[in-house]
């Protein structure tokens, strides 16, 4: 049976505001579903909830039951207009953000996965303990806030090294999945893994001091542990497992693996010790149990749908110094082994990050070379999925499969938030309209410029016959240390260069390249990366002290980043370019705003589908805005954020089109309310720029990650 989704159409509705929540763009997916008329079949006459929110996927199980899943990869609202008496309640999966891996010297621990809260039946951990929570009833008029926790940012220098846990995800006020604990770092007193939804792995330093793994939030687990006052309170339900202990500081050993939602992270040494991250859980809630799940990752059992895997621990050199520890199934990042030649992992190679929208923990790193800054893997962001049963009168059948499917304006729309395939059967013969958006570039930091938006392209292409077409949805650029190559190593000393660009999104109909990274201090914004003819927007210039600096140039699918402020001594950065206009130059008293984005074509302006975010005038369906440049006193007041993402020339306090707001100097914490904000998920927005040195240990506030890309495909219903 084909993929099913709602068949009734609705006209455009007003947009909603989009504040940032817990490090992610808070966008309300106004996804209302009207009821169809009753038929003569009693089962067909049964109706499900009339509800809105998130990206929608409606699917049929082998037993004939039809479910509607609301998938939230960014914060929003699940709103129930009318609750069903035929199919009461909802089932849910809530996953917190993953913790970062440990960094700096030593065998560092893997980050713990985000905790898992679910009432799906039959879900158990490695001890066969049921994780299934009670039923969740809903009523007419319920408006349930959904919060998506950001993953902890992997660090690259300074102290403390085991600092950045994931943030919690929530479904209403009562269902909370805690963020994962950060992995232990290599400095004295920092070797223990942090507690969290799943515990971070322990680390070991030289001189030797082995660190224990952090506690996961298990039923009956202590609230705190020795040396770790930040343990999460017990939830009353098991959420995750413990991190592994570090092995001794010897060749061939690893830091402990981060805990996963299903199993503990492995110890980093001794009999059977490999530093592997603990496995996550397979929860098939977003799609039919007989098909590959549209969300989650592959794992030991077929069908994907794994979430909350722990990050692998970092290694020491040994007989096989290129060996890496393994991440747990469910989106965790691999830890990195030591090495001593260019053909192996160089000492200090960065840990892999957890995958977005899985809650996976970040990978730990190995010992660094002298004078190197080393970055641990960041944790993956969390996710919330809500589903309920609906009747046959509320569905229609699509002609193709792939992505999340909706019907609007006589068209069938496939929305790809993650990489997948678009599959057409032999009778298929349609002219498909499409939009492809590349990943946004990261914002720079230390008086940086905003990241450039990913490339934006739209068009039509004929498709006939049986095809399995690869759809690649890009990730946004990571907010790495300025001047740091993609292997994660950078020389110490004054900052220079630019942050990491976004990646290209593609399908056979078209490709859109990533946006350029924002510059740092006196650096020039990065040009749009290759492929140049399809490149996105350029990154914004840094403050340009002592002289001026230029914004990055654009490819054919974007616009240039802004230049530094005149005068050369103003502590403000320029905005990154947007798909609809160039980034604003840095201003004498404020950061430049990111270049304006574009509004999706009319075909894709479906209020039920969830694509795009608000733009100028509060209108919805905008994408690919540039990241805002930074502010820093005394050039600008400390009470206002930096340049507005995606706004175009002028000043604002809220972002447009998925561009991240630039940061301002108010405090030392990475999670400061005026810290740089990331580009919006699935908008291709550029990340906002960070400000100058803040904390006693000399850290520099980080720029925001670039927003991930998007692919939309439509054809006549």
Give a label for each model feature.
Residues 2-717:
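Low-complexity, glycine/proline-biased repetitive segments and flexible coils/loops
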């Amino acid at each position: 049976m084909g993929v099913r989704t709602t068949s009734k159409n609705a006209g455009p509705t007003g947009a909603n505001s989009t504040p940032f929540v817990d490090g992610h763009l808070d966008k309300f997916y106004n996804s209302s579903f009207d009821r169809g008329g009753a038929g003569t079949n009693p089962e067909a006459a049964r109706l499900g909830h009339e509800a809105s929110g998130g990206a929608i996927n409606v699917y049929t199980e082998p037993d004939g039951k039809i479910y509607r899943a609301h998938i939230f990869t960014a914060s929003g609202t699940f709103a129930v207009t009318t609750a069903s008496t035929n199919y009461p309640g909802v089932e849910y999966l809530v996953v917190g953000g993953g913790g970062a891996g440990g960094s700096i010297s030593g065998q560092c621990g893997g980050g713990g996965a985000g905790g898992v809260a679910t009432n799906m039946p039959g879900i158990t951990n490695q001890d066969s303990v049921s994780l299934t929570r009670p039923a969740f009833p809903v009523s007419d008029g319920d408006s349930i806030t959904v919060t998506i926790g950001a993953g902890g940012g992997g660090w690259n220098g300074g102290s403390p090294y085991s600092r950045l846990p994931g943030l919690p995800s929530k479904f209403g006020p009562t269902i909370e999945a805690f963020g994962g604990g950060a992995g232990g770092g290599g400095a004295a007193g920092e070797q223990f893994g942090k507690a969290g939804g799943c515990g971070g792995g322990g680390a070991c330093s030289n001189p030797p001091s082995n660190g224990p793994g952090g506690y996961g939030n298990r039923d009956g687990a202590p609230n705190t542990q020795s040396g770790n006052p930040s343990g999460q309170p017990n939830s009353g339900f098991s959420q995750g497992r413990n991190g592994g202990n570090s092995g001794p500081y010897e060749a061939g050993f690893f830091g402990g693996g981060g805990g996963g939602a299903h199993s503990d992270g492995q110890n980093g040494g001794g009999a059977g010790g490999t530093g592997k991250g603990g496995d996550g859980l397979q929860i098939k809630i977003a799609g039919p149990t007989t098909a590959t799940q549209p969300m989650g990752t592959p794992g030991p059992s077929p069908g994907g749908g794994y979430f909350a895997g722990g990050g692998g621990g970092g290694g020491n050199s040994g007989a096989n110094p290129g060996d890496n520890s393994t991440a747990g199934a469910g989106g965790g990042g691999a830890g990195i082994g030591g090495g001593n030649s260019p053909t192996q992992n160089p000492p200090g190679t960065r840990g892999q990050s957890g995958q977005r929208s899985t809650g996976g923990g970040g990978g730990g790193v190995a010992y660094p070379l002298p004078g190197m800054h080393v970055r641990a893997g960041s944790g993956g962001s969390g996710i919330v999925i809500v589903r309920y049963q609906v009747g046959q009168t509320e569905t229609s059948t699509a002609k193709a499969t792939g992505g999340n499917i909706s019907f609007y304006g006589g068209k069938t729309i496939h929305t790809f938030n993650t990489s997948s395939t678009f599959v057409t059967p032999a009778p298929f013969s349609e002219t498909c309209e499409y939009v492809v958006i590349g990943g946004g570039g990261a914002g720079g930091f230390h008086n940086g410029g905003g990241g450039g938006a990913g490339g934006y392209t739209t068009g039509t292409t004929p498709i006939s016959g049986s095809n399995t077409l690869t759809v690649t949805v890009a990730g946004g650029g990571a907010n790495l240390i300025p001047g740091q190559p993609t292997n994660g190593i950078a020389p110490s000393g004054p900052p220079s260069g630019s942050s990491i660009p976004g990646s290209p999104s593609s399908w056979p109909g078209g490709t859109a390249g990533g946006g350029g990274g924002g510059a740092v201090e006196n650096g020039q914004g990065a040009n749009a990366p290759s492929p140049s003819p399809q490149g996105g927007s350029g990154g914004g210039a840094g403050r340009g002290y002592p002289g001026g600096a230029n914004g990055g140039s654009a490819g054919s699918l974007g616009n240039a980043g802004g230049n530094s402020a005149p005068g050369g001594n103003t502590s403000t950065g320029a905005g990154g370019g947007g798909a609809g206009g160039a980034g604003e130059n840095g201003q004498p008293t404020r950061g430049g705003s990111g270049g304006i984005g574009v509004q999706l074509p009319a075909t894709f302006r479906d209020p039920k589908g969830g694509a795009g975010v608000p733009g100028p005038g509060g209108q919805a369906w905008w994408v690919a805005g540039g990241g805002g440049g930074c502010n820093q006193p005394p050039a600008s007041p400390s009470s206002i954020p930096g340049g507005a993402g995606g706004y175009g020339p002028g000043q604002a306090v809220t972002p447009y089109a998925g561009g991240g707001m630039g940061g301002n100097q108010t405090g030392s914490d990475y999670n400061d309310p005026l810290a740089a904000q990331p580009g919006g998920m699935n908008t291709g927005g550029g990340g906002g720029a960070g400000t100058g040195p803040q904390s006693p240990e000399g850290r520099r506030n980080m720029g925001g990650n670039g927003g991930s890309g998007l692919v939309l495909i439509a054809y006549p219903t």
